[in-house]
């Protein structure tokens, strides 16, 4: 009656199949690579460093050896709604991002840390493009980017102790709108996908 692989009683297979069936879907708003991970369980040939900016960025980070000297400690997976909410609250409890001035370099460091420790591909932390408050495209991520008042930026840059390369001193050079932004926790973003309402095209 068939080979040993034709039987459903292969040790452990029913548990693996059930685990695959119960895998959480990727959160709304994640990138193409995370969609591949959700659908196929791996990065497909349609997403390479040549065709996908997130893959190219990650490859460059690994080649430069900046950031973290370790390889991912867990399997690669897409960011899910539950994981985004949990990560947001974890960072809030640890006091990690609240009020921290945003820069692309700081976002890259956060993405690399999460990639290496949690296995989430770094294409999930994207924000709406307009000036003003930037809302996360990934549903469940509870940090939005809020412009810092110009007088606070000027106050931070007064005196002799100003650090020229600190993100607040760069006056928004990383930002297309030239705004100085800070991460701000907003628990309502776990229940209300503002980015989807403002930009249904994403």
UniProtKB/Swiss-Prot annotation:
The modification Phosphoserine is found at residue 6. Changing residue 123 to G: In Nef*4; complete loss of Nef-PTE1 interaction, Nef-induced CD4 and MHC-I down-regulation and enhancement of infectivity. The virion-associated Nef proteins are cleaved by the viral protease to release the soluble C-terminal core protein. Nef is probably cleaved concomitantly with viral structural proteins on maturation of virus particles. Keywords: AIDS, Apoptosis, Early protein, Host cell membrane, Host Golgi apparatus, Host membrane, Host-virus interaction, Inhibition of host adaptive immune response by virus, Inhibition of host autophagy by virus, Inhibition of host MHC class I molecule presentation by virus, Inhibition of host MHC class II molecule presentation by virus, Lipoprotein, Membrane, Myristate, Phosphoprotein, Secreted, SH3-binding, Viral immunoevasion, Virion, Virulence. It is found in: Host cell membrane; Virion; Secreted; Host Golgi apparatus membrane. Changing residue 108 to A: Complete loss of Nef-PTE1 interaction and Nef-induced CD4 down-modulation. A motif (Diacidic) lies at residues 174-175. Residues 148-180 are annotated as: Binding to ATP6V1H. Residues 108-124 are annotated as: Mediates dimerization, Nef-PTE1 interaction. Residues 69-78 are annotated as: SH3-binding. Induction: Expressed early in the viral replication cycle. HIV-1 lineages are divided in three main groups, M (for Major), O (for Outlier), and N (for New, or Non-M, Non-O). The vast majority of strains found worldwide belong to the group M. Group O seems to be endemic to and largely confined to Cameroon and neighboring countries in West Central Africa, where these viruses represent a small minority of HIV-1 strains. The group N is represented by a limited number of isolates from Cameroonian persons. The group M is further subdivided in 9 clades or subtypes (A to D, F to H, J and K). The N-terminal domain is composed of the N-myristoyl glycine and of a cluster of positively charged amino acids. It is required for inner plasma membrane targeting of Nef and virion incorporation, and thereby for infectivity. This domain is also involved in binding to TP53. This is Protein Nef. The lineage of its organism: Viruses, Riboviria, Pararnavirae, Artverviricota, Revtraviricetes.
């Amino acid at each position: 009656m068939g080979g040993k692989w034709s039987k459903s009683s292969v040790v452990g297979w029913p548990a693996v199949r059930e685990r695959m069936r119960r895998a959480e879907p990727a959160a709304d708003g994640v990138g193409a690579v995370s969609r591949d991970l959700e659908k196929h369980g791996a990065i497909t040939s349609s997403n390479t460093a040549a065709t996908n900016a997130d893959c190219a960025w990650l490859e460059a980070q690994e080649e430069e050896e900046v950031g973290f000297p370790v390889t991912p400690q867990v399997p690669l997976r897409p960011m899910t709604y539950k994981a985004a909410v949990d990560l947001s609250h974890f960072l809030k409890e640890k006091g990690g991002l609240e009020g921290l001035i945003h820069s692309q370099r700081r976002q890259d460091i956060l993405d690399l840390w999460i990639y290496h420790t949690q296995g989430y591909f770094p294409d999930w932390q994207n924000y709406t493009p307009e000036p003003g408050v930037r809302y996360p495209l990934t549903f469940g991520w509870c940090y939005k980017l809020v412009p810092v008042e110009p007088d606070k930026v000027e106050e931070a840059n007064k005196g002799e102790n100003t650090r020229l390369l600190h993100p607040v001193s760069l006056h928004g050079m990383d930002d297309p709108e030239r705004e100085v932004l800070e991460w701000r926790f907003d628990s309502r973003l776990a229940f209300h996908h503002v980015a989807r309402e403002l930009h249904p095209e994403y």
